[in-house]
């Protein structure tokens, strides 16, 4: 009797539990909202609900830039090498890029918790260069922040490949700027470099475009040729050599009397000119660098330093870098760009004014776009084709190359003129190669005669400065 009562009670309890289960469990499932999978990128825009804190015992894998390029890591995974236990809350507020795709920042912001922005160093078509403090290595670095536009991002990845190739073979790190790291931050490729001094162009500009002493030009020219020879040995062509892309390693400089201005009154401080305390330089900006086997029919180089074969469209290769070096050496000696122009016909007319007529065999090979600059075979359509009187004056005021150099160089002028004539030969097949130029008497004679290297401190009254 009692056992039947117990069985009835048990069945009643089971029915109640079954009823509750059928009612409550579906209610809980409907009530529970589905959650989206959280993005693993710490710098993403904040979600509506804060993600759960990561477990303290979990150590995530270490990701590096090259793994992203090879596709081993999905794009939404941020390279964890910049986390290293730093708080993820260090991300600055999410700001939209400007209309040109430049990254918008405020001094004091962080690029990942590792890098804090100190100042803006410069801006170009590629993006911006920011001075940052590396919280991990406790050093100041320069970070190139690329615009968030596909073509610039793709060019940046090519530059990273070139930089890693150059760094891998440059054991001493003395020729080209050293890449420290790279990462993708809010759709901006960021390349971390060692911090260097000002460019040769910036130094000239801040020095009122006063020329460098010939001994300093010799040291700068030797290092520049060594850098380019190193690149050419790796079958790389820089294609954009100019004073803006040559950086002094140190920002320190000194003031010395400028004897050219001592005979007449001038404005504040113009009795003196600045000289770098160290002549050490490094080559930068490899975004336009190309390999020997790639197509070489498009336009390269900044206008003032562009070789004639590029303008004529007859194809270019390693020699286009040597032409640019010749133009740079003239600029360092004189303080002014050799060919200050912005149009092809005027540029070719300036070349003929300084270096003589273009060779007919190059003119006859010119592409269709360049045929309009010539008439009656290989004769340049000048001055008839000049667009203005100012253009005519700009060409006519230029002296021949030997006269131009002798206006600014007191000694070693003969060797320098001969070197420049070899670097500025029209026919690229006859132009000096980088290592051939390094063996020129302009560089070797100083060693044979035991001439000491450039000394920026020859005077007892000097003022040490730092840019």
Curated annotation (Swiss-Prot):
Catalytic activity from the UniProt record: L-seryl-[protein] + ATP = O-phospho-L-seryl-[protein] + ADP + H(+); L-threonyl-[protein] + ATP = O-phospho-L-threonyl-[protein] + ADP + H(+); L-tyrosyl-[protein] + ATP = O-phospho-L-tyrosyl-[protein] + ADP + H(+)
Superkingdom assignment: Eukaryota
CDD domains recorded: PKc_CLK
EC number: 2.7.12.1
Record has tRNA-binding as a keyword: no
InterPro entries referenced in this protein's UniProt entry, alphabetically: CLK_kinases (IPR051175), Kinase-like_dom_sf (IPR011009), Prot_kinase_dom (IPR000719), Ser/Thr_kinase_AS (IPR008271)
Cysteines paired by S-S bonds: none
Positions bound to ATP: 121-129, 144
Alphabetical GO biological process terms: regulation of DNA-templated transcription
Residue positions of the active site: 240
UniProt keyword annotation of Glycoprotein present: no
Free-text function comment from the UniProt entry: Activator of yeast transcription factor, STE12.
Family note: Belongs to the protein kinase superfamily. CMGC Ser/Thr protein kinase family. Lammer subfamily.
Name of the protein in its database record: Serine/threonine-protein kinase AFC1
Source species: Arabidopsis thaliana
């Amino acid at each position: 009797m009692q056992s039947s009562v117990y069985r009835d009670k048990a069945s009643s309890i089971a029915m109640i539990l079954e009823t509750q289960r059928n009612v409550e469990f579906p209610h809980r499932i409907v009530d529970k909202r589905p959650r989206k999978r959280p993005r693993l990128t710490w710098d993403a825009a904040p979600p509506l609900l804060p993600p759960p804190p990561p477990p303290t015992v979990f150590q995530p894998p270490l990701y590096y830039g090259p793994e992203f390029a090879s596709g081993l890591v999905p794009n939404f995974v941020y390279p964890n090498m910049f986390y290293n236990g730093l708080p993820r809350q260090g991300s600055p507020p999410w700001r939209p890029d400007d209309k040109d795709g430049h990254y918008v920042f405020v001094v004091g912001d962080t690029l990942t918790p590792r890098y804090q922005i100190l100042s803006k160093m410069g801006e170009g078509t590629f993006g911006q260069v920011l001075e940052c403090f590396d919280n991990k290595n406790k050093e100041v670095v320069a970070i190139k922040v690329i615009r968030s536009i596909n073509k610039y991002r793709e060019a940046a990845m090519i530059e990273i490949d070139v930089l890693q190739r150059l760094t891998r073979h440059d054991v001493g790190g003395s020729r080209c700027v050293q890449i420290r790291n790279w990462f993708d931050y809010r759709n901006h490729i960021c390349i971390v470099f060692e911090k260097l001094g000002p460019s040769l162009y910036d130094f000239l500009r801040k020095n009122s475009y006063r020329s460098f002493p010939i001994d300093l030009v010799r040291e700068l020219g030797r290092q520049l040729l060594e850098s380019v020879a190193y690149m050419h040995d790796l079958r790389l062509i820089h294609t954009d050599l100019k004073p803006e892309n040559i950086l002094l390693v140190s920002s320190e400089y000194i003031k010395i009397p400028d004897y050219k201005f001592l005979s007449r009154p001038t404005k504040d401080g113009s009795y003196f000119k600045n000289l770098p305390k160290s002549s050490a330089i490094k080559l930068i900006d490899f975004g336009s660098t190309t390999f020997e086997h790639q197509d070489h029919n498009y336009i390269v180089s900044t206008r003032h330093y562009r070789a004639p074969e590029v303008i004529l469209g007859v194809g270019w290769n390693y020699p286009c870098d040597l032409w640019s070096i010749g133009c740079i050496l003239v600029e360092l000696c004189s303080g002014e760009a050799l060919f200050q122009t912005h149009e092809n016909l005027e540029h070719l007319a300036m070349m003929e004014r300084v270096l003589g007529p273009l060779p007919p065999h190059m003119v006859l090979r010119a592409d269709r776009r360049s045929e309009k600059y010539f008439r009656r075979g290989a004769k340049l359509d000048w001055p008839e084709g000049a667009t203005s009187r100012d253009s005519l004056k700009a060409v006519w005021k230029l002296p021949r190359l030997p006269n131009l150099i002798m206006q600014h160089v007191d000694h070693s002028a003969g060797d320098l003129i001969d070197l420049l004539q070899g670097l500025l030969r029209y026919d690229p097949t006859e132009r000096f190669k980088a290592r051939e130029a390094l063996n020129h008497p302009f560089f070797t004679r100083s060693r044979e005669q035991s001439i000491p290297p450039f000394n920026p401190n020859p005077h007892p009254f000097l003022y040490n400065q730092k840019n």
